[in-house]
Amino acid sequence: MLAQLFEQLFQSIDSTLITNIFIWAVIFVFLSAWWCDKKNIHSKFREYAPTLMGALGILGTFIGIIIGLLNFNTESIDTSIPVLLGGLKTAFITSIVGMFFAILFNGMDAFFFANKRSALAENNPESVTPEHIYHELKEQNQTLTKLVSGINGDSEGSLIAQIKLLRTEISDSSQAQLANHTHFSNKLWEQLEQFADLMAKGATEQIIDALRQVIIDFNENLTEQFGENFKALDASVKKLVEWQGNYKTQIEQMSEQYQQSVESLVETKTAVAGIWEECKEIPLAMSELREVLQVNQHQISELSRHLETFVAIRDKATTVLPEIQNKMAEVGELLKSGAANVSASLEQTSQQILLNADSMRVALDEGTEGFRQSVTQTQQAFASMAHDVSNSSETLTSTLGETITEMKQSGEEFLKSLESHSKELHRNMEQNTTNVIDMFSKTGEKINHQLSSNADNMFDSIQTSFDKAGAGLTSQVRESIEKFALSINEQLHAFEQATEREMNREMQSLGNALLSISKGFVGNYEKLIKDYQIVMGQLQALISANKHRG
Protein backbone atom coordinates (compact mmCIF):
# COMPACT_ATOMS: atom_id res chain seq x y z
CA MET A 1 0.00 0.00 0.00
CA LEU A 2 2.67 2.50 1.04
CA ALA A 3 5.03 1.23 -1.64
CA GLN A 4 2.46 1.89 -4.32
CA LEU A 5 1.86 5.36 -2.87
CA PHE A 6 5.59 6.21 -3.02
CA GLU A 7 5.85 4.79 -6.53
CA GLN A 8 2.96 6.94 -7.74
CA LEU A 9 4.50 9.99 -6.02
CA PHE A 10 7.93 9.50 -7.58
CA GLN A 11 6.46 8.74 -10.98
CA SER A 12 4.51 12.00 -10.95
CA ILE A 13 7.46 14.16 -9.89
CA ASP A 14 9.69 15.69 -12.52
CA SER A 15 13.39 14.89 -12.14
CA THR A 16 14.43 18.49 -12.96
CA LEU A 17 12.28 19.85 -10.12
CA ILE A 18 13.84 17.37 -7.68
CA THR A 19 17.31 18.41 -8.86
CA ASN A 20 16.60 22.12 -8.24
CA ILE A 21 15.11 21.42 -4.82
CA PHE A 22 18.15 19.46 -3.63
CA ILE A 23 20.60 22.02 -5.07
CA TRP A 24 18.86 24.90 -3.23
CA ALA A 25 18.69 22.83 -0.04
CA VAL A 26 22.44 22.12 -0.14
CA ILE A 27 23.19 25.82 -0.84
CA PHE A 28 20.96 26.91 2.06
CA VAL A 29 22.71 24.50 4.46
CA PHE A 30 26.12 25.72 3.26
CA LEU A 31 25.29 29.41 3.76
CA SER A 32 23.74 28.77 7.17
CA ALA A 33 26.76 26.79 8.33
CA TRP A 34 29.11 29.47 7.02
CA TRP A 35 27.18 32.19 8.86
CA CYS A 36 27.24 30.21 12.12
CA ASP A 37 30.92 29.49 11.74
CA LYS A 38 31.69 33.17 11.15
CA LYS A 39 29.67 34.31 14.15
CA ASN A 40 30.88 31.34 16.22
CA ILE A 41 27.37 30.25 17.10
CA HIS A 42 25.49 26.96 16.87
CA SER A 43 28.68 24.90 16.96
CA LYS A 44 26.72 21.63 16.80
CA PHE A 45 24.98 22.66 13.59
CA ARG A 46 28.32 23.84 12.21
CA GLU A 47 29.91 20.45 12.93
CA TYR A 48 26.92 18.55 11.45
CA ALA A 49 26.65 20.73 8.28
CA PRO A 50 29.18 18.75 6.09
CA THR A 51 27.50 15.46 6.96
CA LEU A 52 24.08 16.97 6.24
CA MET A 53 25.18 18.25 2.82
CA GLY A 54 26.68 14.81 1.94
CA ALA A 55 23.52 13.07 3.13
CA LEU A 56 21.36 15.40 0.97
CA GLY A 57 23.54 14.59 -2.02
CA ILE A 58 23.22 10.85 -1.44
CA LEU A 59 19.47 11.18 -0.86
CA GLY A 60 19.12 13.03 -4.14
CA THR A 61 21.12 10.33 -5.86
CA PHE A 62 18.83 7.56 -4.72
CA ILE A 63 15.69 9.57 -5.48
CA GLY A 64 16.95 10.23 -9.00
CA ILE A 65 17.69 6.54 -9.53
CA ILE A 66 14.24 5.60 -8.22
CA ILE A 67 12.55 8.12 -10.55
CA GLY A 68 14.46 6.70 -13.52
CA LEU A 69 13.75 3.09 -12.64
CA LEU A 70 10.07 3.60 -11.86
CA ASN A 71 9.47 5.37 -15.16
CA PHE A 72 11.44 2.75 -17.18
CA ASN A 73 9.14 0.58 -19.31
CA THR A 74 10.65 -2.42 -21.02
CA GLU A 75 7.96 -2.48 -23.63
CA SER A 76 8.71 1.05 -24.82
CA ILE A 77 12.40 1.42 -24.37
CA ASP A 78 12.61 4.44 -26.66
CA THR A 79 10.32 6.50 -24.47
CA SER A 80 11.69 5.14 -21.18
CA ILE A 81 15.37 5.89 -21.86
CA PRO A 82 15.00 9.73 -21.58
CA VAL A 83 13.16 9.35 -18.27
CA LEU A 84 15.85 6.95 -17.00
CA LEU A 85 18.60 9.31 -18.08
CA GLY A 86 16.81 12.24 -16.38
CA GLY A 87 16.66 10.28 -13.12
CA LEU A 88 20.34 9.36 -13.39
CA LYS A 89 21.15 13.01 -14.16
CA THR A 90 19.34 14.05 -10.97
CA ALA A 91 21.20 11.38 -8.99
CA PHE A 92 24.65 12.43 -10.15
CA ILE A 93 24.02 16.21 -9.96
CA THR A 94 22.66 16.09 -6.40
CA SER A 95 25.48 13.85 -5.21
CA ILE A 96 28.10 16.07 -6.85
CA VAL A 97 26.58 19.28 -5.40
CA GLY A 98 26.30 17.75 -1.91
CA MET A 99 29.87 16.47 -1.87
CA PHE A 100 31.24 19.74 -3.41
CA PHE A 101 29.69 22.04 -0.83
CA ALA A 102 30.64 19.64 2.01
CA ILE A 103 34.27 19.62 0.87
CA LEU A 104 34.21 23.42 0.33
CA PHE A 105 32.83 24.07 3.80
CA ASN A 106 35.38 21.74 5.43
CA GLY A 107 38.20 23.54 3.61
CA MET A 108 36.98 26.99 4.57
CA ASP A 109 36.49 25.90 8.14
CA ALA A 110 39.99 24.43 8.30
CA PHE A 111 41.71 27.46 6.76
CA PHE A 112 39.68 30.41 8.16
CA PHE A 113 37.64 29.51 11.21
CA ALA A 114 39.53 26.68 13.01
CA ASN A 115 42.38 28.95 14.27
CA LYS A 116 39.89 31.53 15.41
CA ARG A 117 37.99 28.90 17.39
CA SER A 118 41.25 27.63 18.95
CA ALA A 119 42.25 31.13 20.07
CA LEU A 120 38.85 31.74 21.54
CA ALA A 121 38.99 28.39 23.30
CA GLU A 122 42.39 29.21 24.81
CA ASN A 123 41.33 32.70 25.92
CA ASN A 124 38.03 31.57 27.22
CA PRO A 125 38.43 28.00 28.45
CA GLU A 126 35.40 26.38 29.57
CA SER A 127 37.09 25.23 32.85
CA VAL A 128 40.38 26.34 34.61
CA THR A 129 42.40 23.52 36.14
CA PRO A 130 45.54 23.57 38.35
CA GLU A 131 47.51 22.53 35.34
CA HIS A 132 46.52 25.73 33.53
CA ILE A 133 47.55 27.77 36.60
CA TYR A 134 50.89 25.98 36.89
CA HIS A 135 51.54 26.44 33.21
CA GLU A 136 50.84 30.17 33.40
CA LEU A 137 53.01 30.64 36.50
CA LYS A 138 55.87 28.77 34.90
CA GLU A 139 55.73 30.97 31.83
CA GLN A 140 55.68 34.10 33.97
CA ASN A 141 58.71 32.85 35.97
CA GLN A 142 60.65 32.22 32.81
CA THR A 143 59.77 35.67 31.52
CA LEU A 144 60.90 37.36 34.75
CA THR A 145 64.16 35.39 34.72
CA LYS A 146 64.88 36.57 31.19
CA LEU A 147 64.03 40.16 32.16
CA VAL A 148 66.38 40.15 35.18
CA SER A 149 69.19 38.61 33.18
CA GLY A 150 68.64 41.24 30.48
CA ILE A 151 68.89 44.09 32.98
CA ASN A 152 71.67 42.88 35.35
CA GLY A 153 73.57 40.58 33.05
CA ASP A 154 77.32 40.73 32.58
CA SER A 155 77.16 40.55 28.85
CA GLU A 156 77.36 43.59 26.62
CA GLY A 157 73.75 43.12 25.58
CA SER A 158 72.40 43.82 29.08
CA LEU A 159 70.51 47.01 29.74
CA ILE A 160 73.01 48.37 32.28
CA ALA A 161 75.94 47.79 29.93
CA GLN A 162 74.09 49.53 27.12
CA ILE A 163 73.31 52.52 29.38
CA LYS A 164 77.00 52.79 30.38
CA LEU A 165 78.08 52.69 26.76
CA LEU A 166 75.46 55.27 25.84
CA ARG A 167 76.61 57.60 28.61
CA THR A 168 80.22 57.30 27.48
CA GLU A 169 79.28 58.04 23.89
CA ILE A 170 77.15 61.03 24.91
CA SER A 171 80.03 62.48 26.98
CA ASP A 172 82.52 62.05 24.15
CA SER A 173 80.08 63.54 21.65
CA SER A 174 79.34 66.57 23.86
CA GLN A 175 83.04 67.28 24.38
CA ALA A 176 83.73 67.02 20.66
CA GLN A 177 80.72 69.24 19.87
CA LEU A 178 81.86 71.84 22.43
CA ALA A 179 85.34 71.89 20.93
CA ASN A 180 83.94 72.27 17.44
CA HIS A 181 81.60 75.06 18.58
CA THR A 182 84.45 76.94 20.26
CA HIS A 183 86.62 76.64 17.17
CA PHE A 184 83.78 77.76 14.92
CA SER A 185 82.96 80.73 17.14
CA ASN A 186 86.56 81.94 17.16
CA LYS A 187 86.87 81.60 13.43
CA LEU A 188 83.51 83.32 12.83
CA TRP A 189 84.46 86.23 15.09
CA GLU A 190 87.73 86.72 13.19
CA GLN A 191 85.90 86.71 9.87
CA LEU A 192 83.30 89.18 11.17
CA GLU A 193 86.00 91.57 12.40
CA GLN A 194 87.72 91.46 9.02
CA PHE A 195 84.44 92.05 7.23
CA ALA A 196 83.54 94.96 9.53
CA ASP A 197 86.92 96.61 8.91
CA LEU A 198 86.51 96.24 5.16
CA MET A 199 82.95 97.58 5.26
CA ALA A 200 83.86 100.56 7.44
CA LYS A 201 86.79 101.48 5.27
CA GLY A 202 84.90 101.14 1.98
CA ALA A 203 81.78 102.91 3.24
CA THR A 204 83.78 105.83 4.72
CA GLU A 205 85.66 106.41 1.49
CA GLN A 206 82.52 106.20 -0.63
CA ILE A 207 80.59 108.52 1.68
CA ILE A 208 83.42 111.05 1.66
CA ASP A 209 83.61 110.95 -2.14
CA ALA A 210 79.84 111.24 -2.51
CA LEU A 211 79.65 114.14 -0.03
CA ARG A 212 82.54 115.91 -1.73
CA GLN A 213 80.84 115.67 -5.12
CA VAL A 214 77.47 116.70 -3.67
CA ILE A 215 79.00 119.73 -1.93
CA ILE A 216 80.77 120.78 -5.13
CA ASP A 217 77.56 120.48 -7.16
CA PHE A 218 75.56 122.24 -4.45
CA ASN A 219 77.99 125.17 -4.31
CA GLU A 220 77.93 125.53 -8.09
CA ASN A 221 74.13 125.34 -8.31
CA LEU A 222 73.75 127.64 -5.30
CA THR A 223 75.97 130.27 -6.88
CA GLU A 224 74.11 130.06 -10.18
CA GLN A 225 70.58 129.89 -8.79
CA PHE A 226 70.92 132.45 -6.02
CA GLY A 227 72.42 135.00 -8.37
CA GLU A 228 69.38 134.75 -10.61
CA ASN A 229 67.03 134.46 -7.63
CA PHE A 230 68.42 137.61 -6.01
CA LYS A 231 67.99 139.48 -9.29
CA ALA A 232 64.43 138.21 -9.65
CA LEU A 233 63.74 139.03 -5.99
CA ASP A 234 65.09 142.55 -6.41
CA ALA A 235 62.88 143.08 -9.46
CA SER A 236 59.89 141.60 -7.61
CA VAL A 237 60.47 143.91 -4.63
CA LYS A 238 60.65 146.91 -6.95
CA LYS A 239 57.44 145.85 -8.66
CA LEU A 240 55.88 145.32 -5.23
CA VAL A 241 56.85 148.85 -4.15
CA GLU A 242 55.45 150.26 -7.40
CA TRP A 243 52.27 148.23 -6.94
CA GLN A 244 51.90 149.52 -3.38
CA GLY A 245 52.26 153.10 -4.65
CA ASN A 246 49.70 152.49 -7.38
CA TYR A 247 47.46 150.77 -4.87
CA LYS A 248 47.69 153.76 -2.54
CA THR A 249 46.87 156.10 -5.43
CA GLN A 250 43.92 153.95 -6.44
CA ILE A 251 42.66 153.90 -2.85
CA GLU A 252 42.86 157.71 -2.75
CA GLN A 253 41.03 157.94 -6.08
CA MET A 254 38.40 155.52 -4.85
CA SER A 255 38.00 157.61 -1.68
CA GLU A 256 37.53 160.75 -3.77
CA GLN A 257 35.07 159.00 -6.05
CA TYR A 258 33.22 157.65 -3.03
CA GLN A 259 33.08 161.19 -1.63
CA GLN A 260 31.74 162.41 -4.97
CA SER A 261 29.13 159.67 -4.86
CA VAL A 262 28.15 160.74 -1.35
CA GLU A 263 27.93 164.36 -2.47
CA SER A 264 25.82 163.39 -5.47
CA LEU A 265 23.53 161.40 -3.19
CA VAL A 266 23.29 164.44 -0.88
CA GLU A 267 22.38 166.58 -3.89
CA THR A 268 19.81 163.98 -4.86
CA LYS A 269 18.42 164.15 -1.35
CA THR A 270 18.28 167.95 -1.61
CA ALA A 271 16.46 167.74 -4.95
CA VAL A 272 13.97 165.28 -3.54
CA ALA A 273 13.49 167.58 -0.54
CA GLY A 274 12.84 170.46 -2.96
CA ILE A 275 10.29 168.32 -4.74
CA TRP A 276 8.70 167.60 -1.40
CA GLU A 277 8.63 171.33 -0.54
CA GLU A 278 7.04 172.10 -3.90
CA CYS A 279 4.48 169.42 -3.25
CA LYS A 280 3.71 171.02 0.09
CA GLU A 281 2.45 174.10 -1.76
CA ILE A 282 -0.39 172.08 -3.24
CA PRO A 283 -2.39 172.05 0.03
CA LEU A 284 -1.86 175.84 0.25
CA ALA A 285 -3.27 176.24 -3.22
CA MET A 286 -6.12 174.02 -2.21
CA SER A 287 -6.74 176.22 0.83
CA GLU A 288 -6.86 179.28 -1.45
CA LEU A 289 -9.28 177.39 -3.69
CA ARG A 290 -11.34 176.65 -0.61
CA GLU A 291 -11.51 180.40 0.15
CA VAL A 292 -12.67 181.11 -3.40
CA LEU A 293 -15.31 178.44 -3.07
CA GLN A 294 -16.39 179.93 0.23
CA VAL A 295 -16.78 183.32 -1.50
CA ASN A 296 -18.83 181.64 -4.21
CA GLN A 297 -20.93 179.95 -1.54
CA HIS A 298 -21.42 183.33 0.14
CA GLN A 299 -22.53 184.81 -3.17
CA ILE A 300 -24.90 181.90 -3.68
CA SER A 301 -26.34 182.49 -0.21
CA GLU A 302 -26.73 186.16 -1.05
CA LEU A 303 -28.56 185.13 -4.22
CA SER A 304 -30.79 182.89 -2.15
CA ARG A 305 -31.49 185.74 0.22
CA HIS A 306 -32.33 187.95 -2.73
CA LEU A 307 -34.60 185.25 -4.08
CA GLU A 308 -36.41 185.16 -0.77
CA THR A 309 -36.83 188.89 -1.11
CA PHE A 310 -38.11 188.33 -4.61
CA VAL A 311 -40.68 185.89 -3.23
CA ALA A 312 -41.86 188.48 -0.75
CA ILE A 313 -41.98 191.05 -3.50
CA ARG A 314 -43.94 188.67 -5.72
CA ASP A 315 -46.60 188.48 -3.05
CA LYS A 316 -46.88 192.23 -3.12
CA ALA A 317 -46.56 192.51 -6.90
CA THR A 318 -50.24 193.06 -7.45
CA THR A 319 -50.12 196.21 -5.40
CA VAL A 320 -46.68 197.56 -6.12
CA LEU A 321 -46.01 196.73 -9.77
CA PRO A 322 -43.84 199.76 -10.47
CA GLU A 323 -41.67 198.87 -7.53
CA ILE A 324 -41.41 195.33 -8.82
CA GLN A 325 -40.19 196.57 -12.17
CA ASN A 326 -37.57 198.70 -10.47
CA LYS A 327 -36.56 195.81 -8.25
CA MET A 328 -36.42 193.50 -11.26
CA ALA A 329 -34.00 195.84 -12.89
CA GLU A 330 -31.91 195.87 -9.72
CA VAL A 331 -32.10 192.10 -9.46
CA GLY A 332 -31.06 191.74 -13.08
CA GLU A 333 -28.05 193.93 -12.46
CA LEU A 334 -27.24 192.00 -9.31
CA LEU A 335 -27.56 188.71 -11.16
CA LYS A 336 -25.34 189.95 -13.94
CA SER A 337 -22.77 191.20 -11.47
CA GLY A 338 -23.00 187.90 -9.49
CA ALA A 339 -22.61 185.84 -12.65
CA ALA A 340 -19.68 188.00 -13.67
CA ASN A 341 -18.12 187.57 -10.23
CA VAL A 342 -18.67 183.81 -10.34
CA SER A 343 -17.14 183.60 -13.81
CA ALA A 344 -14.19 185.74 -12.74
CA SER A 345 -13.71 183.67 -9.59
CA LEU A 346 -13.86 180.43 -11.57
CA GLU A 347 -11.39 181.76 -14.12
CA GLN A 348 -9.07 182.93 -11.36
CA THR A 349 -9.34 179.58 -9.61
CA SER A 350 -8.63 177.67 -12.81
CA GLN A 351 -5.64 179.91 -13.55
CA GLN A 352 -4.26 179.36 -10.05
CA ILE A 353 -4.73 175.61 -10.36
CA LEU A 354 -2.99 175.65 -13.75
CA LEU A 355 -0.15 177.75 -12.35
CA ASN A 356 0.24 175.42 -9.38
CA ALA A 357 0.14 172.38 -11.66
CA ASP A 358 2.76 173.95 -13.97
CA SER A 359 4.99 174.89 -11.04
CA MET A 360 4.63 171.40 -9.60
CA ARG A 361 5.40 169.83 -12.97
CA VAL A 362 8.46 172.07 -13.37
CA ALA A 363 9.61 171.20 -9.84
CA LEU A 364 9.12 167.49 -10.50
CA ASP A 365 10.95 167.76 -13.82
CA GLU A 366 13.81 169.64 -12.17
CA GLY A 367 13.97 167.12 -9.29
CA THR A 368 13.86 164.21 -11.73
CA GLU A 369 16.56 165.79 -13.89
CA GLY A 370 18.74 166.51 -10.84
CA PHE A 371 18.28 163.00 -9.54
CA ARG A 372 19.05 161.59 -12.99
CA GLN A 373 22.20 163.70 -13.20
CA SER A 374 23.30 162.63 -9.71
CA VAL A 375 22.70 158.97 -10.52
CA THR A 376 24.55 159.44 -13.82
CA GLN A 377 27.46 161.02 -11.97
CA THR A 378 27.43 158.14 -9.52
CA GLN A 379 27.44 155.65 -12.37
CA GLN A 380 30.28 157.52 -14.07
CA ALA A 381 32.24 157.70 -10.82
CA PHE A 382 31.82 153.98 -10.16
CA ALA A 383 32.58 153.19 -13.80
CA SER A 384 35.87 155.12 -13.57
CA MET A 385 36.50 153.43 -10.22
CA ALA A 386 35.94 150.02 -11.81
CA HIS A 387 38.25 150.99 -14.72
CA ASP A 388 41.04 152.00 -12.33
CA VAL A 389 40.67 149.01 -10.07
CA SER A 390 40.54 146.59 -13.02
CA ASN A 391 44.21 147.45 -13.76
CA SER A 392 45.33 146.15 -10.33
CA SER A 393 43.46 142.86 -9.86
CA GLU A 394 41.21 140.61 -11.94
CA THR A 395 39.21 139.65 -8.86
CA LEU A 396 38.64 143.29 -7.94
CA THR A 397 37.60 144.01 -11.52
CA SER A 398 34.99 141.29 -11.52
CA THR A 399 33.68 142.41 -8.10
CA LEU A 400 33.43 146.08 -9.07
CA GLY A 401 31.94 145.14 -12.42
CA GLU A 402 29.19 143.19 -10.75
CA THR A 403 28.68 146.02 -8.22
CA ILE A 404 28.49 148.67 -10.95
CA THR A 405 26.13 146.53 -12.97
CA GLU A 406 23.86 146.09 -9.97
CA MET A 407 24.02 149.83 -9.17
CA LYS A 408 23.37 150.71 -12.78
CA GLN A 409 20.40 148.39 -12.91
CA SER A 410 19.10 149.72 -9.60
CA GLY A 411 19.70 153.32 -10.76
CA GLU A 412 17.91 152.68 -14.03
CA GLU A 413 15.07 151.00 -12.18
CA PHE A 414 14.91 153.93 -9.76
CA LEU A 415 14.94 156.43 -12.66
CA LYS A 416 12.25 154.49 -14.45
CA SER A 417 10.20 154.29 -11.27
CA LEU A 418 10.70 158.01 -10.57
CA GLU A 419 9.87 158.97 -14.15
CA SER A 420 6.80 156.75 -14.16
CA HIS A 421 5.64 158.18 -10.84
CA SER A 422 6.34 161.74 -12.01
CA LYS A 423 4.56 161.20 -15.32
CA GLU A 424 1.65 159.56 -13.58
CA LEU A 425 1.48 162.40 -11.04
CA HIS A 426 1.73 165.02 -13.78
CA ARG A 427 -0.86 163.23 -15.87
CA ASN A 428 -3.23 162.88 -12.92
CA MET A 429 -2.77 166.53 -11.98
CA GLU A 430 -3.39 167.69 -15.54
CA GLN A 431 -6.40 165.44 -15.82
CA ASN A 432 -7.82 166.59 -12.49
CA THR A 433 -7.12 170.24 -13.34
CA THR A 434 -8.74 169.85 -16.74
CA ASN A 435 -11.72 168.14 -15.18
CA VAL A 436 -12.08 170.94 -12.61
CA ILE A 437 -11.76 173.64 -15.28
CA ASP A 438 -14.21 171.90 -17.58
CA MET A 439 -16.57 171.34 -14.73
CA PHE A 440 -16.34 174.98 -13.64
CA SER A 441 -16.72 176.19 -17.23
CA LYS A 442 -19.69 173.94 -17.87
CA THR A 443 -21.24 174.93 -14.58
CA GLY A 444 -20.68 178.64 -15.30
CA GLU A 445 -22.07 178.31 -18.80
CA LYS A 446 -25.00 176.38 -17.45
CA ILE A 447 -25.63 179.05 -14.82
CA ASN A 448 -25.34 181.85 -17.38
CA HIS A 449 -27.59 179.99 -19.78
CA GLN A 450 -30.12 179.32 -17.07
CA LEU A 451 -29.96 182.94 -15.91
CA SER A 452 -30.40 184.28 -19.44
CA SER A 453 -33.09 181.80 -20.40
CA ASN A 454 -35.04 182.17 -17.20
CA ALA A 455 -34.91 185.97 -16.95
CA ASP A 456 -38.39 186.27 -18.52
CA ASN A 457 -40.03 183.80 -16.17
CA MET A 458 -37.96 184.34 -13.02
CA PHE A 459 -41.11 184.81 -10.98
CA ASP A 460 -41.94 181.14 -11.63
CA SER A 461 -38.58 179.23 -11.63
CA ILE A 462 -35.74 181.42 -10.35
CA GLN A 463 -35.87 179.96 -6.85
CA THR A 464 -35.75 176.33 -8.11
CA SER A 465 -33.01 177.02 -10.67
CA PHE A 466 -30.73 178.78 -8.24
CA ASP A 467 -31.28 176.09 -5.61
CA LYS A 468 -30.39 173.34 -8.09
CA ALA A 469 -27.44 175.32 -9.44
CA GLY A 470 -26.09 176.07 -5.95
CA ALA A 471 -26.52 172.49 -4.77
CA GLY A 472 -24.97 171.01 -7.93
CA LEU A 473 -22.09 173.48 -7.91
CA THR A 474 -21.39 172.91 -4.24
CA SER A 475 -21.49 169.10 -4.44
CA GLN A 476 -19.48 168.87 -7.65
CA VAL A 477 -16.85 171.34 -6.49
CA ARG A 478 -16.61 169.61 -3.13
CA GLU A 479 -16.33 166.13 -4.68
CA SER A 480 -13.79 167.31 -7.24
CA ILE A 481 -11.68 169.03 -4.63
CA GLU A 482 -11.84 166.03 -2.29
CA LYS A 483 -10.92 163.60 -5.09
CA PHE A 484 -8.11 165.87 -6.23
CA ALA A 485 -6.78 166.25 -2.68
CA LEU A 486 -6.94 162.49 -2.04
CA SER A 487 -5.21 161.74 -5.34
CA ILE A 488 -2.49 164.28 -4.64
CA ASN A 489 -1.93 162.98 -1.11
CA GLU A 490 -1.82 159.33 -2.24
CA GLN A 491 0.60 160.11 -5.06
CA LEU A 492 2.81 162.18 -2.79
CA HIS A 493 2.80 159.44 -0.16
CA ALA A 494 3.60 156.77 -2.77
CA PHE A 495 6.32 158.98 -4.24
CA GLU A 496 7.81 159.56 -0.79
CA GLN A 497 7.78 155.85 0.06
CA ALA A 498 9.24 154.82 -3.31
CA THR A 499 11.95 157.47 -3.06
CA GLU A 500 12.85 156.49 0.49
CA ARG A 501 12.85 152.78 -0.36
CA GLU A 502 15.01 153.21 -3.46
CA MET A 503 17.43 155.51 -1.63
CA ASN A 504 17.78 153.04 1.25
CA ARG A 505 18.29 150.13 -1.11
CA GLU A 506 20.86 152.00 -3.19
CA MET A 507 22.75 153.16 -0.11
CA GLN A 508 22.67 149.63 1.33
CA SER A 509 23.92 148.05 -1.91
CA LEU A 510 26.58 150.77 -2.23
CA GLY A 511 27.75 150.19 1.35
CA ASN A 512 27.84 146.41 0.85
CA ALA A 513 29.77 146.77 -2.40
CA LEU A 514 32.31 149.13 -0.82
CA LEU A 515 32.60 146.82 2.19
CA SER A 516 33.26 143.79 -0.05
CA ILE A 517 35.81 145.83 -2.05
CA SER A 518 37.60 146.86 1.15
CA LYS A 519 37.58 143.28 2.42
CA GLY A 520 38.99 142.09 -0.91
CA PHE A 521 41.75 144.70 -0.76
CA VAL A 522 42.59 143.78 2.83
CA GLY A 523 42.60 140.04 2.07
CA ASN A 524 44.82 140.45 -1.00
CA TYR A 525 47.19 142.73 0.91
CA GLU A 526 47.42 140.32 3.86
CA LYS A 527 48.01 137.37 1.53
CA LEU A 528 50.75 139.33 -0.28
CA ILE A 529 52.41 140.27 3.04
CA LYS A 530 52.32 136.61 4.19
CA ASP A 531 53.84 135.40 0.89
CA TYR A 532 56.52 138.10 1.17
CA GLN A 533 57.31 137.06 4.75
CA ILE A 534 57.53 133.39 3.73
CA VAL A 535 59.89 134.21 0.85
CA MET A 536 62.08 136.41 3.10
CA GLY A 537 62.19 133.68 5.77
CA GLN A 538 63.26 131.06 3.23
CA LEU A 539 65.85 133.44 1.81
CA GLN A 540 67.29 134.24 5.25
CA ALA A 541 67.45 130.53 6.10
CA LEU A 542 69.31 129.78 2.87
CA ILE A 543 71.72 132.71 3.44
CA SER A 544 72.45 131.63 7.04
CA ALA A 545 72.96 128.02 5.92
CA ASN A 546 75.37 129.17 3.20
CA LYS A 547 77.29 131.27 5.71
CA HIS A 548 77.65 128.33 8.11
CA ARG A 549 78.92 126.14 5.27
CA GLY A 550 81.37 128.85 4.19
UniProtKB/Swiss-Prot annotation:
Disulphide linkage map: none
BP GO annotations: defense response to virus
Annotated localization: Cell inner membrane
Transmembrane segments: 16-36, 52-72, 92-112
Its membrane topology: Multi-pass membrane protein
Pfam families (UniProt xref): MotA_ExbB
GO annotations of cellular component type: plasma membrane
Keywords on record: Antiviral defense, Cell inner membrane, Cell membrane, Membrane, Transmembrane, Transmembrane helix
Keyword Cell inner membrane attached: yes
InterPro entries hit by this protein: MotA_ExbB_proton_chnl, ZorA-like_t2
Gene3D superfamilies the UniProt entry points to: Apolipoprotein
Function: Component of antiviral defense system Zorya type II, composed of ZorA, ZorB and ZorE. Expression of Zorya type II in E.coli (strain MG1655) confers resistance to phages SECphi7 and T7. While most T7 infected Zorya-containing cells undergo abortive infection, a minority produce viable phage progeny. These eventually accumulate to a high multiplicity of infection, leading to culture collapse by 170 minutes after initial infection. ZorA and ZorB probably assemble in the cell inner membrane and exert their effect there.
Family the UniProt entry places it in: Belongs to the MotA family.
Name of this chain's protein: Zorya protein ZorA
Source organism of the structure: Escherichia coli (strain ATCC 8739 / DSM 1576 / NBRC 3972 / NCIMB 8545 / WDCM 00012 / Crooks)
Organism placement in taxonomy: Bacteria, Pseudomonadati, Pseudomonadota, Gammaproteobacteria, Enterobacterales
